[in-house]
Amino acid sequence: MASHDQSYKAGETMGRTEEKTNQMIGNIEDKAQAAKEKAQQAAQTAKDKTSQTAQAAKEKTQQTAQAAKEKTQQTAQAAKDETQQTAQAAKDKTQQTTEATKEKAQDTTGRAREKGSEMGQSTKETAQSGKDNSAGFLQQTGEKVKGMAQGATDAVKQTFGMANDDKDKDHFPTNRH
């Protein structure tokens, strides 16, 4: 009977061992499941943190880009304003120079007219006093007066920029070539 007892005890031991093994496997499975859930939670937390960081970086990049855009617009506007001011100053200076040139031309024209009138009067007086002189003398005087009048006319034309370069080249040489 010993063998039957031994067999019974062996079966009993085996049953207990199997039960304990199943309990240990159950505990290991529970712990594995808990570890799995904990790992999933950690992964989700990391994913959420990464998403938040990426969103914050995206927003910061957008803010920086917007600030750069605004700064560029401000700089462009300032450059535009400066250009307009410079152009206006140049326009004003040109108008002043034009006005001064016009006044000088009018003054020169007035003086040329006076000189021409004086020459005409002088010619008239010379002609009257020299009526008795020979025709050659009168012709010579007339040519001189004509030359002086032509010189005054050319000076006025040159002042107004109406001179023909080829015609007046001998009287008013220029450095333009």
UniProtKB/Swiss-Prot annotation:
Ranges: Sequence repeats: 53-63, 64-74, 75-85, 86-96
Region (4 X 11 AA approximate tandem repeats of T-A-Q-A-A-K-E-K-T-Q-Q): 53-96
Record has Repeat as a keyword: yes
Biased composition annotated in UniProt, kind: Low complexity: 40-89
Biased composition (Basic and acidic residues): 28-39, 90-117, 164-177
Induction: Up-regulated in response to water stress.
Region named Disordered: 1-177
Keyword terms: Repeat
Tissue spec. comment: Highest expression is found in seeds. No expression detected in adult tissues.
Skewed-composition ranges (Polar residues): 119-142
Protein family: Belongs to the LEA type 4 family.
Protein name: Late embryogenesis abundant protein 1
Species per Swiss-Prot/TrEMBL record: Cicer arietinum (Chickpea)
